[in-house]
């Protein structure tokens, strides 16, 4: 699998502004260079794949872990921005595109402690199980109404009479519920 770096928009803006003001790295003082390096270390984290579907997989993994068993049904409610940006994106290691496989794998093999590398344990067997999970129509993905957050992911996992919920909002790894 390929590894991608995830960088927050605010961090990119800060670096861009710093570089515009300071012109180039070679004209910076040692202190300014250290500040930029520290900013990058603070704001850049490893991710496998595009951050939107991987953040959804992370939220699903957290809800499934909270449920304590394999979910029978998964409901995913997303902000328009996440839905738009995640639907047509390839999921590394799967040969597939879109949210359904990210959701299925998040539930089946995802580990929330891996953050945006939540699917790093993906195998061909897991992908086949994910395809079956999708074929059984166990996943419902829809737009969350009345959300002002651009980044909002809500997942409800159900199995029998048990229910678990997880919510990410504001940042790709910011679990708020």
PLM regions and their residue ranges:
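Signature of multi-pass transmembrane helix bundles
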Residues: 135-177
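Generic N-terminal amphipathic, Lys/Arg-enriched alpha-helix
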Residues: 35-48
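Aromatic (phenylalanine/tyrosine) cluster motif
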Residues: 3-6, 16, 25-27
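Alpha-helical support elements that line or immediately flank enzyme active sites
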Residues: 53-69
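A structural-propensity feature for long, helix-poor, extended segments
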Residues: 71-115, 127-139
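Acidic-glycine-rich active-site phosphate/pyrophosphate-binding loop
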Residues: 28-37, 68-82
């Amino acid at each position: 699998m390929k590894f991608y770096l995830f960088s927050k928009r605010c961090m990119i803006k800060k670096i861009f502004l710093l570089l515009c003001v300071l012109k180039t790295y070679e004209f910076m003082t040692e202190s300014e260079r250290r500040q930029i390096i520290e900013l990058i270390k603070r704001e850049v984290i490893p991710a496998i794949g595009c951050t939107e579907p991987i953040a959804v997989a992370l939220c699903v993994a957290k809800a499934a872990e909270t449920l304590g068993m394999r979910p029978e049904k998964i409901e995913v409610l997303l902000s328009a921005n996440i839905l738009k940006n995640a639907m047509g994106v390839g999921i590394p290691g799967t040969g597939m595109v879109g949210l359904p496989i990210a959701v299925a794998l998040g539930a089946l093999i995802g580990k929330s402690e891996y953050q945006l590398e939540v699917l790093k344990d993906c195998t061909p067997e897991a992908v086949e199980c994910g395809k079956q999970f999708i074929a059984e129509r166990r996943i419902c993905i829809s737009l969350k109404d009345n959300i002002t957050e651009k980044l909002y992911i809500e997942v409800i996992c159900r199995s029998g009479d048990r229910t678990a919920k997880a919510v990410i909002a504001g940042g790709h790894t910011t679990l708020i519920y």
